[in-house]
């Protein structure tokens, strides 16, 4: 999966992942800005969250 998933980059995780919309800003920006098929949010401790762009497959 490491070849498929690439972090969006910058400190965008919380802003891209916190709003409860579908599809998330993470998915929207990965598609629009990076040419990815989808994106997903990985939550860590507290507000530590990463937006990962998926270049291999569409995910809900």
Curated annotation (Swiss-Prot):
The record marks 20-21 as: Reactive bond. One of its GO terms (molecular function) is sodium channel inhibitor activity. It holds the Pfam family Toxin_3. This is Defensin-like protein 4. SMART domains: Knot1. InterPro entries: Scorpion_toxin-like, Scorpion_toxin-like_sf, Scorpion_toxinL/defensin. Keywords: Antimicrobial, Disulfide bond, Fungicide, Plant defense, Secreted. One of its GO terms (biological process) is killing of cells of another organism. Disulfide bonds join 4-56, 17-41, 26-51, 30-53. Inhibits trypsin and chymotrypsin. Gene3D superfamilies: Knottin, scorpion toxin-like (3.30.30.10). It is found in: Secreted. Belongs to the DEFL family. Protease inhibitor I18 (RTI/MTI-2) subfamily. One of its GO terms (cellular component) is extracellular region. It comes from Brassica napus (Rape).
